[in-house]
């Protein structure tokens, strides 16, 4: 399968500049390489419970650790527009608003930790702050948030989320519903994967 074959609802991989390993020629190889890289972040953040201060620096650091052996731009906000996400000029401001909103939700306590994690996940996907890996990044940040708050972890069907059809279509529909302000579908979808 060619590397540039695009998956519906994903950032297209038309631009491979910044790809660190030079032996990768297919999307399958890229997915395997990235999964190995992401595992390092999972081990760092989900190995033992710790307090997490979610701020801009930390949000960039998580992405950097997830992709630092795969992409030169790991942990750096994108600097052009793609088919998904806010205009790249708005990324920094939107990320600041997200951090502020999360602090408000935590202080206000009108939303459960689970509902906060779903909104955090959704907003990161909607902003799409990085060139690629935003879905996996958003799910991991949400998992870290849950774990730090003594909540059960989610077991995402990552392979199924890479393939068009079934679960991926349900996931995208749930995200699109959240885009319109209704988090019910995304919460129901996410609940299916609680450990």
Can you describe what each PLM-predicted range is?
Residues 1-195:
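FIC/Doc superfamily catalytic core
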């Amino acid at each position: 399968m060619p590397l540039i074959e695009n998956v519906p609802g994903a950032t297209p991989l038309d631009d491979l500049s910044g790809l660190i390993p030079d032996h990768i020629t297919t999307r399958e190889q890229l997915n395997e390489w990235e999964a190995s890289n992401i595992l390092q972040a999972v081990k760092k953040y989900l190995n033992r419970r710790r307090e997490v201060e979610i701020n801009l620096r930390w949000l960039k650091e998580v992405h950097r650790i997830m992709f630092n052996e795969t992409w030169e731009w790991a942990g750096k906000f994108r600097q052009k527009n793609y088919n998904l996400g806010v205009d790249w000029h708005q990324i920094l401001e939107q990320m600041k608003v997200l951090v502020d909103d999360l602090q408000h939700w935590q202080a206000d306590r009108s939303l459960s930790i689970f509902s906060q994690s779903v909104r955090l996940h959704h907003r990161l996907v909607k902003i799409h702050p990085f060139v690629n890996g935003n879905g996996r990044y958003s799910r991991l940040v949400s998992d870290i948030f849950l774990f730090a708050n003594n909540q059960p972890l989610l077991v995402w069907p990552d392979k199924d989320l890479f393939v068009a059809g079934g679960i991926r279509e349900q996931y995208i529909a749930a995200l699109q519903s959240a885009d319109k302000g209704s988090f019910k579908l995304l919460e129901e979808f996410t609940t299916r994967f609680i450990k």
